[in-house]
């Protein structure tokens, strides 16, 4: 995506959304224009948020001068991808995270792997403690390590895939189209942050306004389906998040 394309898409979203999350599965730190995107988003009144696997933090010191409001680092990706040398990884993550937090960015170190690849969680927390000593303040979802610096834990869930079997859940729920949408690099609007392949295209921001797209028959059917706790789209029927989200407060 070019800077002009980003400018066009964010202009289309201005006044309609508040938060911009710079990922739809991809690794945002790979994009050379990420600092410019963040600064433009701030100028337009958006609140930018980045989720990253943290492997490129040491190479992107330029981001320290163009920090988002919030930086989420998925530590669980390290064990899930079978990477070596966790000490070096945590070293690089913590060096960037502590500096970003001191500059006012909210940094969340995520361990979203309960019930899955979580064998290294204990050692990872110990490595973090070597670089940000305990005691930490316990929270409902993890710990506060210092001002603007947190560790957050959550259950692992299975990403949606049309090749998966349908979940046999009597009730499902999702925040798609309630408090989130996704926009792919080509302008395609999808219902949520998990539809990275564009399996549920609702329209394109280069062709239509967001309000026109959200009023489409496909979008309204999906929204009303989740209102009645039913997944109407094949991809949603194969999504681990909607299957486990009964533990969340259901919104009408």
Over which residues does each language-model region extend?
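Short Cys/His-rich "knuckle" micro-motifs
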Residues: 246-249
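Short, acidic, Ser/Thr-enriched surface-loop or helix-capping motifs
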Residues: 184
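Conserved glycine-rich "GG(E/T)P / GGGxP" loop and the immediately following alpha-helix
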Residues: 1-140, 144
